[in-house]
From Swiss-Prot:
ATP binds at A10, Y11, S12, G13, G14, L15, D16, T17, S18, A37, G118. It comes from Pseudomonas aeruginosa (strain ATCC 15692 / DSM 22644 / CIP 104116 / JCM 14847 / LMG 12228 / 1C / PRS 101 / PAO1). Pathway: Amino-acid biosynthesis; L-arginine biosynthesis; L-arginine from L-ornithine and carbamoyl phosphate: step 2/3. Homotetramer. L-aspartate binds at T120, N124, D125. Pfam families: Arginosuc_syn_C (PF20979), Arginosuc_synth (PF00764). It catalyses: L-citrulline + L-aspartate + ATP = 2-(N(omega)-L-arginino)succinate + AMP + diphosphate + H(+). This is Argininosuccinate synthase. Signal peptide: none annotated. CDD domains: ASS. InterPro entries: Arginosuc_syn_C, Arginosuc_syn_N, Arginosuc_synth, Arginosuc_synth_CS, Arginosuc_synth_type_1_subfam, AS_cat/multimer_dom_body, Rossmann-like_a/b/a_fold. PROSITE patterns: ARGININOSUCCIN_SYN_1, ARGININOSUCCIN_SYN_2. L-citrulline binds at Y88, S93, N124, R128, S179, S188, E264, Y276.
């Protein structure tokens, strides 16, 4: 323990990380630097400063990372139309590499020997934090208290906090029965009744979205302007990336968009049920595919779709800073050069419906695609040779007596 003199802790100010703070001070006899990230989770982060100071912390970092989060992590991910296991929009996963990056930056700034986090030994986040940290600073020491201590229940954490004078709320406002994580992209719910995969989630669990049944009876129309694959304006009003996502969360939430209840495969081997609200992200995914549908070459679009599951898996499992993810990102970004234009959407009772798309870079040619007289733009007789050449290998196989049965 003597080799650790200063540790940077990813600190929320909640029970777990407050206990970790004290545990680090006592177990390692070290100085602790706290880092609290504002990723748009909708909670006040300033109380973490007062709590850390009360626990003897001299160096306290509270960083507003909302713009960086959306600009450098969420937007690049959505250029790939990223979805994990067909449904999950990776709201938790995509936040972890930014936190890891900032932990390492602060460790370098403060001369810390180690970093620490509050992720448990049963989840994905420990992997995401630590893979990111090692990629950015190979020799860094990582302290993961949940893999070391014997405080394996909430009651034990509460008892430890009371014993060491850590401010807690044992009584007071009702605590959510769920384990929750939020940022500007989503809010997640795990644990509690959700651990029974047959039990329906309770309606009052959802924080961001109206139920589709109770959403407005009149649809909402919005127009999203794209530049190189990123949304830059809503209804003609220029916005920053964080402003875009904030507004889409608002209008999507009102219309009951973005709820999800899934069982996913964790990287550490177990299956886990999670419920997610991702109103803005759900809208972004639908709209981005719509603008790509008229601006991307067919084979480029198909290749992107083939590679997307691998890209999604890299994010989910913590390999954001890996060479393979960076390589894929260069390809994805190159594909977005002509992904410009406007998408018009109708939002109604949990549904996102594309009702229009236009672009100066559109590859859609109405003169060729029309069902009416095309004035010779497309010679239908050419199709006969095209079909015969593509059928050649199957005709040869059939002539050899090969069958599909």
């Amino acid at each position: 323990m003597a080799d650790v003199k200063k540790v940077v802790l990813a600190y929320s100010g909640g029970l777990d990380t407050s206990v970790i703070l004290k545990w680090l001070q006592d177990t390692y006899n070290c100085e602790v630097v706290t880092f609290t990230a504002d990723l748009g989770q909708g909670e006040e982060v300033e109380p973490a400063r007062a709590k850390a100071r009360a626990m003897g912390v001299k160096e306290i970092y509270i960083d507003d990372l909302r713009e960086e989060f959306v600009r450098d992590f969420v937007y690049p991910m959505f250029r790939a139309n990223t979805v994990y296991e067909g449904e999950y929009l990776l709201g938790t996963s995509i936040a972890r590499p930014l936190i890891a990056k900032r932990l390492i930056e602060i460790a370098n700034e403060t001369g810390a020997d180690a970093i620490s986090h509050g992720a448990t030994g049963k989840g994905n986040d420990q992997v995401r934090f630590e893979l990111g940290a090692y990629a950015l600073k190979p020799g860094v020491k990582v302290i993961a208290p949940w893999r070391e201590w014997d405080l394996l229940s909430r009651e034990k954490l509460m008892d430890y906090a009371e014993k060491h004078g850590i401010p807690i709320e044992r009584h007071g406002k009702k605590k959510s029965p769920y384990s929750m994580d939020a940022n500007l992209l989503h809010i997640s719910y795990e644990g509690g009744v959700l651990e029974d995969t047959w039990t329906e989630h309770e309606e009052d669990m959802w924080k961001w979205t109206a139920s589709p049944e109770n959403a407005p009876d009149t649809p909402t129309y919005i127009e999203l302007t794209y530049r190189k694959g990123d949304i830059v304006a809503i209804d003609g009003k220029d916005m920053t990336p964080a402003e875009v996502l904030t507004e889409l969360n608002r209008v999507g939430g009102i219309n009951g968009i973005g709820r999800l209840d899934i069982v996913e495969n964790r990287y550490v081997g177990m299956k886990s049920r999670g419920c997610y609200e991702t109103p803005g992200g759900t809208i972004m995914l639908k709209a981005h595919r719509a603008i790509e549908s008229i601006t991307l070459d067919r084979e480029v679009a198909h290749l992107k779709d083939e590679l997307m599951p691998k890209y999604a898996s890299l994010i989910y499992t913590g390999y954001w800073w890996s060479p393979e993810r960076l390589m894929l990102q260069q390809m994805i970004d190159a594909s977005q050069v002509n992904v410009n234009g406007v998408v018009r959407l109708k939002l109604y009772k949990g549904n996102v419906v594309v009702v229009g798309r236009k672009s100066d870079d559109s590859l859609f040619d109405a003169n060729i695609a029309t069902f009416e007289e095309d004035g010779g733009a497309y010679n239908q007789a050419d199709a006969a040779g095209f079909i015969k050449l593509n059928a050649l290998r199957m005709r040869i196989a059939a002539n050899k007596g090969r069958t599909l049965s």
